[in-house]
Design a protein with these regions (language model features):
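Amphipathic alpha-helical scaffolding segments comprising HEAT/armadillo-like alpha-solenoid repeats
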Residues: 1-5, 28-44, 63-76, 95-115, ...
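N-terminal leader/linker segments that initiate helical-solenoid repeat arrays
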Residues: 1-22
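Alpha-helix N-cap/helix-start positions at coil->helix boundaries
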Residues: 15, 49-50, 65, 79-83, ...
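Alpha-solenoid HEAT/ARM repeat scaffold
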Residues: 19, 53-54, 69, 82-87, ...
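HEAT-repeat alpha-solenoid elements in large eukaryotic scaffold proteins
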Residues: 41-50, 82-92, 117, 157-163
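Structural signature of alpha-helical solenoid repeat scaffolds
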Residues: 61, 90-94, 132, 164-165, ...
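Ankyrin-repeat and related helical/solenoid repeat scaffolds used for protein-protein interactions
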Residues: 153, 157-210
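Eukaryotic acidic, Ser/Thr-rich intrinsically disordered low-complexity regions
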Residues: 210-250
Length: 250
C-alpha cells in the first residue's frame, strides 16, 4: 500500500470513521514504513485539532522499539519536527510501547526541556504537557516557573496540568510533589487572571492533595466562571492552611 497516497485520498474525504479508514490506520501502525507514518503525523499536527484524523497519533506506538529509535534520531531536527518526535516519545513512555534505557530517557527529557523554552507558544505547550508524562522531581521547578511567568495562558495551564499527571502516575511521592508545588500554586490562585488556567490549577490541587473543592473538569472546560472562582477560593484557603500548619510544626 502507498500509505501517503491513501492518506491524501482519505484526507480529501474528511478522514471519515469507516472500516476503510480503520484498516488504513491499523496497517500503517503495523507497517515498517515508520518515516511515512511520522511524516503523516507531522502533516496532521499542522491541521486544526477538529480536522485531525483519528488513530494517526495513537497508532505510532505499534512500531515499538524501531519507532522509538527513529524518533530519538529526530530530536535534533528543526523545532516543529523535534516537538512532534518528543511528544510521540513521551506517549511511548506512557503507553509502555517499548523500554528506554537511562541514557535514552535523559535524551528525551533534555529535548523536551529545550523545546519548553522556544518562542513559539504551541511548541512550549506541547513540551510542557509531555514533561508531565515523563518528568522527574528535578523538573518541578521548571514547571513552577512556567506556571507563574509564561506569557501564554495555555502554557501556564499545562504546567499546572503536568503536576496533575505527575501525581496520577505516582512517579513522584505526593509529599514531595505537594511541598515543591504548594507555593507556586498559591501564587497562581492569587494572581492568575485566566479562568481556564485557574480552573486547571484547582483540578491539580484536588488530585495532588487527594481532596475536592467541588470543581468538575466539565466546569473548567466550559468556563463556568462562578464555579471556578468559588473552588479557587476554597483551594487557596486550603493551601494557606497547609502552610500555617507546616510553619507551626517547624
Amino acid at each position: 500500500m502507498d500509505f501517503l497516497e491513501e492518506y491524501k485520498r482519505l484526507k480529501a474525504q474528511g478522514f471519515p470513521i469507516t472500516e476503510e479508514t480503520i484498516n488504513f490506520v491499523t496497517a500503517l501502525g503495523k507497517s515498517d514504513d515508520i518515516e511515512t507514518h511520522f511524516d503523516i503525523y507531522c502533516m496532521e499536527m499542522k491541521c486544526p485539532k477538529q480536522e485531525r484524523g483519528f488513530g494517526i497519533y495513537e497508532g505510532f506506538a505499534d512500531h515499538g522499539k524501531a519507532g522509538g529509535e527513529y524518533l530519538l534520531a529526530r530530536l535534533d531536527d528543526e523545532e516543529d519536527i523535534a516537538i512532534n518526535a518528543g511528544y510521540l516519545l513521551s506517549s511511548y513512555r506512557v503507553q509502555k510501547a517499548c523500554h528506554f534505557n537511562a541514557e535514552e530517557n535523559a535524551t528525551i527529557l533534555r529535548a523536551l526541556l529545550r523545546l519548553a523554552e522556544f518562542k513559539t507558544a504551541e511548541v512550549r505547550r506541547r513540551s510542557l504537557i509531555a514533561i508531565g508524562w515523563v518528568g522527574t522531581e528535578k523538573e518541578i521547578e521548571i514547571l513552577n516557573r512556567h506556571l507563574l511567568t509564561d506569557e501564554d495562558s495555555l502554557c501556564r495551564a499545562w504546567s499546572a496540568s503536568s503536576f496533575l499527571q505527575m501525581g496520577m502516575s505516582q512517579r513522584i511521592g505526593s509529599d514531595i510533589l505537594q511541598a515543591k508545588t504548594r507555593d507556586s500554586l498559591i501564587k497562581c490562585l492569587q494572581s492568575e487572571t485566566n479562568a481556564f488556567t485557574k480552573g486547571v490549577a484547582v483540578e491539580t490541587i484536588q488530585t495532588v492533595w487527594d481532596t475536592s473543592f467541588g470543581l468538575r473538569a466539565s466546569a473548567v472546560d466550559s468556563l463556568k466562571i462562578k464555579a471556578i472562582e468559588r473552588a479557587s477560593a476554597k483551594a487557596l484557603l486550603f493551601l494557606e492552611h497547609k502552610d500555617s500548619r507546616l510553619t507551626h510544626q517547624n
